[in-house]
Swiss-Prot record:
Organism for this UniProt entry: Talpa europaea (European mole)
Residues annotated as site: Implicated in catechol agonist binding: 163, 167
Segments passing through the bilayer: 1-25, 37-62, 73-95, 118-140, 157-180, 362-385, 395-397
Protein name, per record: Alpha-2B adrenergic receptor
Region (Disordered): 193-212, 230-319
Disulfide bonds listed in the record: 72-151
Ranges in the topological domain labelled Extracellular: 63-72, 141-156, 386-394
Lineage: Eukaryota, Metazoa, Chordata, Craniata, Vertebrata
Annotated Gene Ontology cellular component terms: plasma membrane
Keywords per UniProt: Cell membrane, Disulfide bond, G-protein coupled receptor, Lipoprotein, Membrane, Palmitate, Receptor, Transducer, Transmembrane, Transmembrane helix
Similarity field: Belongs to the G-protein coupled receptor 1 family. Adrenergic receptor subfamily. ADRA2B sub-subfamily.
Bias-annotated ranges (Acidic residues): 280-300
Amino acid sequence: AIAAIIIFLILFTIFGNALVILAVLTSRSLRAPQNLFLVSLAAADILVATLIIPFSLANELLGYWYFRRMWCKVYLALDVLFCTSSIVHLCAISLDRYWAVSRALEYNSKRTPRRIKCIILMVWLIAAVISLPSLVYKGDQGPQPSGAPQCNLNQETWYILASSIGSFFAPCLIMILVYLRIYLIAKRSHCRGPRAKGAPGKSKFKQSRQVPGGTLASAKVPNLAAHLVAAGETNGRSKPTGEKEMGETPEDSGTSTLPPSWPALPNSGQDQKEGICEASLEEEAEEEEEGEEEREEECEPQALPASPASACSPPLQQPQGSQVLATLRGQVLLGRAAGAASGQWWRRRTQLSREKRFTFVLAVVIGVFVLCWFPFFFSYSLGAICPQQCKVPHDLF
């Protein structure tokens, strides 16, 4: 029964990892450089299933090493090599996730296939260094039953502890710390949201909406009503185009006026009243980003200028990339600024969201993998620390 289960696991491992390699190599959407880690990891698992597990199963069922002595040394070295490579691959993937989440735009520009291949090569070199002593140094292999050749790893305490730390405990500690750091970054980003000071793409202008009274007004234009009211004085006289307002800020002086080709506001008379809403930019920006309902203040009726040209005289603050239109009913439409900084910020936000989802999936996979390996390495190390008092039963091991 145990042999049948092991054979099924061997076939399942080969088939599943072959599908992973085939999917990454054939699917255009999976040809990202970081997926090369999955190809190398799947190759290591296939090598474990084909070159290690069958011989381990035969050794357990027969009770002795049936094959040649030279193959025993190669088998032990490959066992440590492939298993260590599999674990260190997961450690490298976790570091790649951390760099992608903490430095999304900067790291993604450096995440080239050449760089990923160099990291994979380093992973295999680390695994080779850890597995080399079992090939060149025989050491103490423990008691050997008479007439029954055995194939065991070096039983010396220093080798057991060194190989266990290098193959499992050190990579496991790195993975735990890295994923803890990723969790803290995600939690801080979720609590802060896009409200970070100086975040690119945070525009002060928003698409206009209909307000009571049939008038369109922008909720994100600071002091819009003050500009329009100041333009039309009680005598109906408009200022010259190039003249500045009293108390005009330096920011206002650098902005341009509406082009003359745009439709002008109609002459609606001195007594015509329209509702123009004044809203605080800071309060509404905070409420919008915290997910709360946007608060609107009651509209105060203000007199529109009697002269059509007077509405175009005062300069409106218009950021680069925004749209300002004047309709036939005298309604001002302000579009959201869509500059390069805004696009960069949204690309970073999308990239972070995708990396966090992928990180969660990998955290589950790595967690299961660590739980499967921990009992073996714990009992293996425990037997070296206290071989007599803490001896683990052979069947359990």
